[in-house]
């Protein structure tokens, strides 16, 4: 990502929930400052809660170098006092034509981990998209930038909701593929609806990795229903959490999932932070949305949904590799 910023010629749009002032954050800051010095228009959008441990001086340095920095939804006298919704999206768009989205934040945990005895980077996934879909990613950034810099409502508004966009990759450089940029908004449940549709139509497999898996009744029913129909349904979740209380909520769903034929694995490493799914070796989702109430129904999220058999095969291979480093749960703890 820093290399992409380093090669930018016109614009850099960076949207992050977590942006730490550690060695990783400093690398990004240096890359942004260097880009601004070259005359590149640089904008950084961060979430107020996500950066609560980052000193203000870190962002003052960026602003002083010509980088536009905006903080989404700081506390104030409005609905929910600015506690929710949060901007949980992770997005980088360079020159409006190339972008990265996924679950990766800017901090040392994604490089070295945070445990002292057994350091290992957090397991996460992002996807780099080039071509016409880059314009959709730029449009998605503009939506959130406008929400953060104007008086537009920070929650979802029926009159301001935009349709999900899709774009074919350039057939001269890529095999035909369809890329949909799905903007998760409060109350829209778009990724949840997509899972339910895919669960009803899947013929072979549904494999899901979710860092904070606290699904709704309808999501559980969609997955268990697919498993009862003979679809290979697999769920990968962490065994260690940066928020330990989430595990108690996740384990609550194991009994029903296992009883209906859904297979569950727990990642053995420090933290599995990915938010991905692959259906029938063809439909791949990579983004910031976890299957829990915050991710699906409350926060602003961003996911890329890609129809491509080659990418689907790669996603399945990556998933199987992760399972080799995980433990299958065969009984409720």
What is each stretch, according to the model?
Residues 1-333:
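Charged, low-complexity intrinsically disordered terminal segments
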């Amino acid at each position: 990502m820093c290399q992409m910023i380093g090669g930018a010629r016109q614009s850099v749009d960076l949207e992050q929930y977590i942006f730490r002032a550690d060695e990783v954050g400093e690398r990004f800051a240096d890359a942004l400052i260097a880009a601004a010095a070259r005359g590149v228009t640089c904008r950084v959008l961060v979430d107020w809660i996500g950066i609560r441990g980052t000193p203000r001086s870190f962002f003052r340095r960026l602003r002083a170098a010509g980088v536009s920095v905006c903080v989404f939804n700081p506390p104030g006298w409005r609905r929910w006092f600015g506690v929710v919704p949060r901007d949980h999206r992770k997005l980088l768009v360079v020159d409006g034509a190339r972008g990265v989205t996924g679950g990766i934040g800017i901090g040392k945990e994604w490089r070295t981990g945070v445990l002292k005895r057994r350091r290992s980077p957090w397991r996460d996934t992002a996807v780099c998209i080039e071509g016409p879909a880059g314009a959709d990613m730029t449009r998605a950034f503009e939506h959130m930038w406008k929400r953060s810099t104007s008086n537009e409502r920070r929650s979802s508004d029926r009159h301001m909701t935009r349709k999900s966009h899709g774009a074919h990759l350039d057939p001269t450089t890529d095999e035909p593929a369809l890329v949909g940029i799905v903007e998760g908004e409060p109350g829209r449940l778009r990724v949840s609806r997509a899972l339910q549709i895919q669960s009803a139509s899947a013929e072979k497999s549904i494999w899901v990795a979710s860092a904070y898996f606290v699904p709704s009744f309808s999501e559980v029913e969609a997955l268990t229903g697919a498993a009862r129909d003979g679809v290979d349904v697999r769920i990968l979740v962490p065994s260690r959490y940066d928020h330990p209380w989430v595990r108690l909520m996740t384990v609550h769903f194991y009994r029903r999932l296992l009883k209906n034929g859904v297979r569950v694995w727990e990642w053995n490493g420090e933290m599995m932070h990915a938010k991905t799914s692959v259906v029938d070796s063809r439909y791949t989702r990579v983004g910031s949305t976890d299957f829990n109430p915050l991710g699906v129904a409350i926060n602003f999220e961003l996911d890329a949904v890609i129809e491509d058999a080659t990418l689907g095969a790669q996603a399945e291979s990556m998933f199987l590799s992760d399972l080799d480093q995980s433990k299958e749960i065969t009984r409720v703890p």
